[in-house]
Design a protein with these regions (language model features):
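C-terminal long alpha-helix characteristic of the crotonase
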Residues: 141-146, 197-246, 259, 275-283
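A general structural signal for well-ordered alpha-helical segments in protein cores
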Residues: 82, 104, 164, 173-176, ...
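Well-ordered beta-strand positions
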Residues: 139, 178, 182-184, 190, ...
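Glycine- (often His-adjacent) and acidic-residue-rich active-site loop
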Residues: 49, 71-113, 126, 154, ...
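Conserved CoA-thioester-binding segment of acyl-CoA-metabolizing enzymes
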Residues: 7-72, 283
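CoA-thioester-processing core
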Residues: 107-115, 121, 127-181, 194, ...
Length: 283
């Protein structure tokens, strides 16, 4: 599948002028590709609209169980397009309102609240907004050639788009301050050591590894279980352990009433692959 998949993607990229490509691949993987390879997939307003349209499509599709995001060409996402940044007004408009809304819109933190797992396949440079997008995904697999940088401090900016929330949770406060203030470039091996990425693989194997992992989730794991677990991990972070434990008891009771539980037990006893239903909207 992976070799054929890459050929299909290359053909799609050559024929399609969209800034984001979307394809559903068996066994239920939505593949979202940032598609401005000539600009290292630098983020634009149009890309943002198309990206979240693709996310919405994947969430609404009962066949989709896992979402994978990657970049076309050599880069993952080089951050906000410099042409877009140069178009941002540096002064208030005449009516006293801030006119600098060119980069506004739906925010990357939405990814932490959707019901399906999102995996970033970081194939190259991830900088600024591109780094934030990857960090807001639930997991990150990186090519061994991938690079990461916050970049904001070297542009006279601040910790944007919620990176001050997500980065310390992944790498700790001291490392987060180092990366934010210095904007230094971090290679994939160091990023994994810090906890920024889950796994580093040879660049030519990245998509094979990611798609195999995503396929395992899609075929063998309860979508409703993944949805609840995702909500627990993000929601329980600031709770005390006693509250989180009590909440888990309630959620466990609810899980016993879903068909996923029966199917999980029966398929195990029958030594067959489970056939879980799509994610339960109430989960």
């Amino acid at each position: 599948m992976p070799g054929v998949l890459m050929m299909r993607l290359q053909r799609l990229r050559s024929l399609n002028m969209s800034e984001v490509l979307y394809e559903v691949i068996e066994p239920g993987i939505a593949l979202i590709t940032l598609n401005r390879p000539e600009r290292l997939n630098a983020w634009t307003g149009r890309m943002g609209v198309e990206y979240f349209d693709a996310i919405d499509k994947a969430v609404a599709d009962a066949k989709v169980r896992v979402i994978v995001v990657t970049g076309a060409g050599k880069g993952y996402c080089a951050g906000a397009d410099m042409g877009t940044l140069q178009g941002i007004p540096t002064e208030k408009s005449s009516d006293g309102k801030d006119d600098s809304n060119i980069l506004e819109g739906r925010m990357q933190d939405e990814i932490t609240r959707i019901s399906k797992p999102v995996i970033a396949a970081v194939n190259g440079a991830a900088a600024g907004l591109g780094l934030v997008q990857a960090l807001m995904c639930d997991m990150r697999f990186a090519a061994d050639t991938a690079k990461f940088t916050c970049a904001f401090s070297k542009r006279g900016l601040i910790a944007e788009y919620g990176v001050s929330w997500v980065l310390p949770r992944l790498v700790g406060q001291a490392n987060a301050l180092d990366l934010l203030m210095s904007s230094r470039v971090v290679m994939a091996a160091e990023a994994q050591q810090m906890g920024m990425v889950n796994r580093v693989v040879p660049a030519d194997q990245l998509m094979d590894v990611v798609m195999a992992y995503a396929a395992d989730l899609a075929m063998n794991v309860s979508p409703s279980s993944m949805s609840v677990m995702k909500r627990q991990v993000y929601g329980d972070y600031d709770k005390d352990v006693a509250t989180a434990s009590l909440d888990a008891l309630k959620l466990m009771g609810q899980s016993f009433t879903r068909p996923d539980f029966k199917e999980g037990v029966v398929s195990y006893l029958q030594k067959r692959q489970a056939d879980f239903p799509p994610v339960d909207p109430s989960a």
